[in-house]
Amino acid sequence: MAFRSDCAIIGACGSKGQKSERMTGMEQMRRVRTTLKDIANACGYSVNTVSRALRGDKRLSKATRSLIQETARSMDYIPNTMASSLRSGRSRMIAVIVNDLHNQHFCDLLNRMDRDLRDQNYNLMILCMHLEETLAGELIHTAISLSVDGILYFPNFGQRHYIEYMTDSGVPFVLLDRRVNEVDADTVRCDDEQGGYLAGQHLAALGHRRFLFLSGMELSSSQIDRLSGFRRALRDSGLPDDCVRVVPGADVEDALAHNTLASFILPRDYTAIVSFRDEVAYPVMNALRDHGLSIPQDVSIISFDNLHAEDPSRPFLTSIYAADENIAEISVRLLLERIEDPMLPPRNIVLPVRIFDQGTTAPPPRA
């Protein structure tokens, strides 16, 4: 960005009528920024002592640390993180590479991760693939080139080659939310197969015999496992495989984009709907009501993610999930442990899920 040589910064020059030296914008910015030397002069300590106090060096007395830190705050001191990184070998920066920021589930996780990382004096950098798998390698390269201390990675459709790239680079990382076969790496995810099973078991126990399953993206491990668990529950309940009509994830997303959900919710050859995620279930509920159908009196619906827990303004929806705070807390802990000890054996954490029953399922209507 170019700066005008005559740009004004309030308080940088003398009052009207006073003679002042003319400075460029860059010079003004340099003049304004407080340095360690400025703090040292104000406190009467050496630059080295000031630096140690701002790092929280407990070999200095608490009174000395407090005085220097308060002086730095009053002078609006901004630390030079790049210089600190060069000295310590740590950037205190964690990159999170996520598939889609439109997905509220991801946003809730990012919010909790940021909070947990800040508690450990780390900053979070968000890099998004925007549903473009080919961007993953570029974003991983960007994160590594910026010397992040670690990566929290939401793999999309497996992406073993990108995971191998991170392994070869030596950067600590944790995989989240997806199962990636034949990869030895720290992983934190929900038990999606169990989640699908719970959905099928719950609906079958209510007496449902005909189902509509609205899928996620075809190659997603979550989609594969949830549908597998759902079908297993129906088989265990004595129901045939053809009692489920499965709508592919690509068709679901297309219907959402073009407001054509009626194309697969009608004709109604089902009494219960299973949605891959809540953000699909909500517009489906609206479409059902637009066609004069009541939930759960006419149609039961169950989904995954439990977004209502994070945003109570959302409608009630029976949903399956493990708590977001558990996923965020565990993934951050595993990554920080990996940063401290790169030789730890890989940990694979699979969190149990449960049904959050919020009144959108009931026995099917009588014929």
Give the location of each predicted region.
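Short beta-strand segments enriched in small/hydrophobic residues
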Residues: 42, 47-52, 86-102, 202, ...
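Short acidic/polar active-site loop segments enriched in Thr and Asp
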Residues: 46, 149, 208-210, 271
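Alpha-helical recognition/docking segments in bacterial nutrient-uptake
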Residues: 2-31, 89-201, 205, 261-267, ...
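Flexible loop/turn connectors
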Residues: 5, 259-367
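Hinge/beta->alpha junction and helix N-cap segments in small-molecule ligand-binding domains
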Residues: 98-108, 126-135, 178, 188-198, ...
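Short acidic capping loops at alpha-helix termini that bridge into adjacent secondary structure
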Residues: 209-210, 241-244, 294-301
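N-terminal helix-turn-helix DNA-binding module of bacterial transcription factors
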Residues: 2-90, 366
